[in-house]
Amino acid sequence: MLGDGKEGTSTIPGFNQIQFEGFYRFIDQGLIEELSKFPKIEDIDHEIEFQLFVETYQLVEPLIKERDAVYESLTYSSELYVSAGLIWKTSRNMQEQRIFIGNIPLMNSLGTSIVNGIYRIVINQILQSPGIYYQSELDHNGISVYTGTIISDWGGRLELEIDKKARIWARVSRKQKISILVLSSAMGSNLREILENVCYPEIFLSFLTDKEKKKIGSKENAILEFYQQFSCVGGDPIFSESLCKELQKKFFHQRCELGRIGRRNINWRLNLNIPQNNIFLLPRDILAAADHLIGMKFGMGTLDDMNHLKNKRIRSVADLLQDQLGLALARLENVVKGTISGAIRHKLIPTPQNLVTSTPLTTTYESFFGLHPLSQVLDRTNPLTQIVHGRKLSYLGPGGLTGRTANFRIRDIHPSHYGRICPIDTSEGINVGLIGSLSIHARIGDWGSLESPFYELFEKSKKARIRMLFLSPSQDEYYMIAAGNSLALNRGIQEEQAVPARYRQEFLTIAWEEVHLRSIFPFQYFSIGASLIPFIEHNDANRALMSSNMQRQAVPLSRSEKCIVGTGLERQVALDSGVPAIAEHEGKILYTDTEKIIFSGNGDTLSIPLIMYQRSNKNTCMHQKPQVRRGKCIKKGQILADGAATVGGELALGKNILVAYMPWEGYNFEDAVLISECLVYGDIYTSFHIRKYEIQTHVTTQGPERITKEIPHLEGRLLRNLDKNGIVMLGSWVETGDILVGKLTPQVAKESSYAPEDRLLRAILGIQVSTSKETCLKLPIGGRGRVIDVRWVQKKGGSSYNPEIIRVYISQKREIKVGDKVAGRHGNKGIISKILPRQDMPYLQDGRPVDMVFNPLGVPSRMNVGQIFECSLGLAGSLLDRHYRIAPFDERYEQEASRKLVFSELYEASKQTANPWVFEPEYPGKSRIFDGRTGDPFEQPVIIGKPYILKLIHQVDDKIHGRSSGHYALVTQQPLRGRSKQGGQRVGEMEVWALEGFGVAHILQEMLTYKSDHIRARQEVLGTTIVGGTIPKPDDAPESFRLLVRELRSLALELNHFLVSEKNFQINRKEV
């Protein structure tokens, strides 16, 4: 429980702070801890000893910059050097050298790592904390069975259970169980020590039979009995040293290593005082656990709630990186042992430098960042996405749960999540509730627990002296914590007498005098995504969840705009995302253009390079625009350049546009959206997308591949954009099918393909004629655009394993179009159904046409009323030229506070602009509007306003797909599935029913056979369709029917088919 130095003040912590703290903990503690575990290594004859001197380790600053590492596809890492000594025991000589152990990827200012030029982030994992947990469940007779589960640091489990005769068993696996007396004896206790150390010796004596006495007569007997049960070995095994080692390795190391967290938890739960450095399970722990289990059976003690956060721990970046370092050093130990024995065998004199290789450490970290489930590619769709990704918490991953096995109780919200894990922000689908998001003020404590801050209120005044504390989930159970209207930002506001509070997982109403702690901030319980939703208190939680997910999918627009109605967190999100360029100290601007800003300060002249049209991994465009003029004096922390989706250092994901909630000719049925052509021609929702196309050159068996402009058999039109080297020129406009990189792959032609005169010449002159196949990089369908960058990455060596890579970056300008997805900040999403001319759109009483028409039926059933408040307040803000930043739950000040604020602002706007239609008392917030086609007013008044609408990354250009013919699956001979594989549509059950309903038998037969999986017929269909002939009817079965026949044959069922002519069919029917 830690206090903050300043009394009564709190600031929002940096949103990347958790990642930084984790990495700092690894560098400061974890690195030394793992290096100090590295053992002294001796040779077989015990003549040479190798050891590391940990105190002198050194991490060297990287030689390359972050930006160069991304550009050249390298890893941004630091070299680790440690002093190592080699001691000759006979002569007592020691040779000490500073050796290079390997590279450790560093964390950059965004809280991410750059591995092979790709931004990667390690997310935090929630695991069951090591310790002991007591639970009860009903058996088939309805009787409670009590169990105590000991969870080790590795996740291994040992279960203690008590049966109806009060006998205690240790369950080693699902099938095997042994008596607790045998387990204690195998761990080194004799019967007298067992009985002295338990509270209920008579119960232990009650199940001590003669057979049991024989088993625990000596430690050897107990170990043999335990080994038999654990390894399921028949017969009579013989006690040996190797048997003990196997048991130690397979059982005690995996299931009995508690770690420091487990030791602390077991000491606390069982009231023991075993030293913290004793991290293995002791016989004393087993006996104390058995005593507690007996107490449980007789109604003493409390059961554990496995889903409470006090029984969970966070496995942070530090723990994961430390585990990988331990793994790498274990591999290094084996390498050193092998090298020492090899050197002695070949009579070579080893040196520390020769014994150690950097491969184990470097490859371990590269494979960790590349393959581990908790190391993910950073999602960089927009600035918000980058920050939110680093604050995720996952129950999945190694040692955790899976989406299929996790039950509903684990996924559900728990009262202990309050202020630590956001109750709203989680993924949708199979992982719902398993991937959460950290609350704004939560932090990870030293013991892996999630801590949340509170103000401590002192008894006398409850206001005068206030101190901030960080409490873990096990600590805040014992305090009355005020919530609700005690969250007043201004402490001068008179607190009410009765306040809602939380105590021991329950929500109560208590007197203000009884409160011990109070929350520090209205947003304290929410994640960043949920905290950016204005009026979130008026929305259903499901819609708030969708909104916090959809804000992460918003595309940065070419001209961004601040939201009129926000929550006040927009600035902090933008600053912490690292997207805007910020002045590190004060100075004066000397020069500025689109590529760099030069300013002088502290006697130095600094040049800040700006990001120019950089591609994110979601193909969005990252670009910085300078915001300062030449000659201007700037202060430390001032914004020098805005990035993608930021304006004036504030997050700006969408646009404030004029919206009407009304039906319009059915074009906004089922969440469809009607928009005005102004949004297209005015470039309101225009965004830039950058696609990357790459090609590699290999050295084949016939020779190296060549990059060239001279490509035979191709039209000159397709090669028009290539330079003399065969690579597309910068700035050229390319269309589908154009060649981006010309490449020839050598191949030797078959003898039969040569003309007779060629063969004669080859026989006489001995010339080997080589032909080449064109393997050019062509622009695929939908890729048209402007070439903005070409990178030729030449790897060292140039072998076939390190091929040269050429990357071409093409920028596309995309206006909004029919089929694109748009969304508000309240889970109100829709697809553009029609783009109307501006003169046909409904228009306001001052003649302005609206930009977008939403369906009003999308509001009541979904209970996201916050959008109506935002819509009306946005209209008032645009007329008054004001921006609003509203904290959630403003009803804590007075009832209907949101409605009063909106109406008062609308009233003021109508007064100041002399437009009475802005606020009409008969139907406040609504206005009469006119049909643009006829000029007649609509029957009912309509809600109009200016909400903040986002354009999402689900765009029709990436989804629309057509195919005439393409690839087929080998087994079924049916078209492949999906756009990426150039797949076809599947006519499924329901589609067949629809066609049957219309009675189109011939079309149905064509779809299911000729056009689908009849190999010969589908080729004929294509030909006859082109020339306009009739489709020939095949007389054999399609491939899927033949597949069915083969599968039946595999079950020894023969199926014959033959043709029955119509004539014979009639005769046979008469005979029947």
Swiss-Prot record:
DNA-dependent RNA polymerase catalyzes the transcription of DNA into RNA using the four ribonucleoside triphosphates as substrates. Belongs to the RNA polymerase beta chain family. Keywords: Chloroplast, DNA-directed RNA polymerase, Nucleotidyltransferase, Plastid, Transcription, Transferase. NCBIfam families: PRK00405.1. HAMAP family: RNApol_bact_RpoB. This is DNA-directed RNA polymerase subunit beta. GO terms for molecular function: DNA binding; DNA-directed RNA polymerase activity; ribonucleoside binding. It comes from the Eukaryota. One of its GO terms (biological process) is DNA-templated transcription. It is found in: Plastid, Chloroplast. Its EC number is 2.7.7.6. It catalyses: RNA(n) + a ribonucleoside 5'-triphosphate = RNA(n+1) + diphosphate. It is an enzyme of class 2 (transferase). It holds the Pfam family RNA_pol_Rpb2_6. GO terms for cellular component: chloroplast; DNA-directed RNA polymerase complex; mitochondrion. SUPFAM superfamilies: beta and beta-prime subunits of DNA dependent RNA-polymerase.
